[in-house]
């Protein structure tokens, strides 16, 4: 053992001695190094080399001021960083990494908790097994959740928030463009500002069950098996389609397939309510297929 002033050393092959004599070192176990003021290394093969650093367990490294590394081969390399677990890494100042192979990889103030959780940007938060928050200020919570853009939020199993300031909440949702929102199970929002809420929606702006809205912004599909597929379209109900600019369809088994068409009503299986360009169709199995007809 090598012992410096006002230090405590117990065990074998420990080192608390520095060139510029420090004080208050504690090394207990085998092959530990505690070489800055008020450092603590307990266990085997630990290194506490930053001022006031603490390394506890097996082969952990706390190399920056007031850093803490605990577990097995954990590393805390940023000032006031905390790394706890097996091969966990807290890279930058004020980072926290807790869990098996959890890691922070960017410039500071990030948190990764859970097996193989990764916080890959400043101010990012990753919670859950294999979660990944790689955007600045992003949040990923849940198993395999991923927030890959700045300010993105993904919460739930395999949910992905890939657009800036996008939100994905639930199971296997995908918000792929800026400012999109998906909530529920298996929803996708593919264009900027889109909303998909419910089950298996593919949406620009949709709420419901198995609805589709795409191509442009300002679309709404609400209900089940609906499609709003052009600019400023609205589809509400079941098996409703609004496919041209400004079209509105409400009810069951309805097609508003003309520009600025309005179709409202219901139809039995095998039938439809239809409206053409600038046309209005209202009622059971109503059809206004001529331009500007009612």
Region spans (language model):
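Glycine- and small/polar-enriched repetitive beta-structure motifs of secreted/surface proteins
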Residues: 1-294
